[in-house]
Swiss-Prot record:
HAMAP family in alphabetical order: 23SrRNA_methyltr_H
A GO molecular function held by the record: rRNA (pseudouridine-N3-)-methyltransferase activity
Enzyme Commission number, as recorded: 2.1.1.177
Protein name: Ribosomal RNA large subunit methyltransferase H
Gene3D superfamilies named in the record: 3.40.1280.10
Keywords: Cytoplasm, Methyltransferase, rRNA processing, S-adenosyl-L-methionine, Transferase
Main location as per UniProt: cytoplasm
Domain of life: Bacteria
Organism this protein belongs to: Deinococcus deserti (strain DSM 17065 / CIP 109153 / LMG 22923 / VCD115)
Subcellular location: Cytoplasm
Similarity remark: Belongs to the RNA methyltransferase RlmH family.
Function of the protein: Specifically methylates the pseudouridine at position 1915 (m3Psi1915) in 23S rRNA.
Pfam families cross-referenced by the UniProt entry: SPOUT_MTase (PF02590)
Length: 145
């Protein structure tokens, strides 16, 4: 399955950029991967850019109000999408103000990383690592212990 990762901006902090690059490289062993960086001056512009970037792919928005997954549950979700014929999933991290209500209501799924507020750069690393971990679980590999 193809994964399309959409972020508002790029990781600015060195640790986050290096973490993103490492897990992006690892994730490419399991999925075709597309990364799109979008921008906008307002929340509405950012959300519109995310919507355009996702195209027709089901859109999973990272949002604090969203469903929380354990790593095995995320793996099962990805597997179910693939078995169900979904060829591509788009995952999006919004800007500092999050996503608009309109984009949220049109999303395939809202995914919450937890109750903590994370810096944008760290959320990017958590996203790509979580997808990598879920992929190794699906492949029966020992990364997740």
């Amino acid at each position: 399955m193809r994964l399309h990762l959409i972020t508002v901006g790029e990781p600015k902090l060195t640790y986050a950029r290096l973490g993103w690059e490492e897990y992006e490289k690892r994730l490419r062993r399991y999925h075709k991967l597309q990364v799109t960086r979008v921008s906008g001056r307002t929340q509405a512009q950012e959300s519109e850019a995310v919507r355009r970037a996702a195209g027709k792919a089901p859109l999973v928005l990272l949002d604090p109000r969203g469903r929380q997954f354990s790593s095995p549950d995320l793996s099962a979700y990805l597997d179910a999408q693939a078995v169900g014929g979904v060829g591509e999933l788009a995952f999006a991290i919004g800007g500092p103000d999050g996503h608009t209500d309109e984009l949220r209501s049109s999303a395939h799924l809202l995914w919450g990383l937890g109750q903590l507020t994370l810096p944008h750069d760290l959320a990017m690393v958590v996203l790509v690592e979580a997808l990598y971990r879920a992929s190794t679980i699906s492949a029966g590999e020992p990364y997740h212990r």
